[in-house]
Amino acid sequence: MTTADAPDADRIAELLLHHQAVQVRPRDPFTWSSGRVAPIYCDNRLLLSSATARNTVQRGFVKHCIAASWQPDVVAGTATAGIPHATSLADRLGTGLAYVRSAAKAHGRQRRIEGRIPDDASVLVVEDLVATGGSALDAVQAVRNAGGHVLGVLAIFAYDFDATRTAFADAQCPLHVLTTFPTVADVAVSSGRLDADARQLLADWHQAPADWASSV
C-alpha cells in the first residue's frame, strides 16, 4: 500500500477530523453494521458538502496518479460513495467515467458496470474507504471480467490492516490512499482531540480489532 507523503497525509487526516468524516471514540465505541465494535467510524460522504474538501481530495488523487505514472483511459468509482470522487478525478484527467455496482441489476440489461469500459482499457478504481478491501477488490475483479486492465485502487482513507495489505498483494492490485488510521489517530492526539491513553486504546484495536471489545 502506498500512502501520501507525511505532510499531505496529515492534512487529509485533519480534513477528515474537521468535517467529522472520521470520528474517534475509544471510550464510547461505535457498533459497525457488521456488528463489530470499534473506536472509530468513517463516513467520507460528509466531505461532499464542502467544495474545499472535494477539491483537496481531487488534488491528492491527481498527485498519486502522477507519482505512479498512471494514465487511465477510464476512472471507475465504486457505488455509491466512490462515484462523486471518481467523477471529479475523471473530469480533472479528461478520461472516461464508469461506476461499479456491488451486484448486477436484477432487471433490464442486468449490468454490474455502468458506463463503457473498452477491451484492454486502463482503468483506475476509486473507493472512498478501504477496510478489509473486500468491496474494492470485488470491483477490481468486475472490471477485469469486463476486459479492463486495472492500474490500481485509489482511496481517501484506509484502516491499514495487515490482512488488507495481503489481500491487495494477492490480487496483484496496487492500493494508494491519501491517509490511514494510524495517521488519523496521531493527528487526533497532536491536535488535542485525544490524550495519550486514548491513543493506546486505538493502537490496541488496530492490532487486534476482532478481540478489542472484550478488553475495554
Listing of model-derived features with the role each one plays in the protein:
Residues 73, 121, 151:
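Conserved acidic residues
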Residues 1-68:
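Active-site-facing substrate-recognition patch
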Residues 2-19, 141-216:
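PRPP-dependent phosphoribosyltransferase catalytic core
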Residues 61-73, 143-146:
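Phosphate/pyrophosphate-binding loops at sites that engage ATP/ADP/AMP, CoA/4′-phosphopantetheine
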Residues 85-124, 132-138:
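Short, glycine/charge-rich flexible loops or terminal/linker lids adjacent to PRPP-binding catalytic cores
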Residues 70-79, 154:
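Short glycine-rich phosphate-binding loop at a beta-alpha junction
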Residues 84, 107-108, 160, 185:
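Generic structural signal for helix capping and beta-alpha/helix-loop junctions
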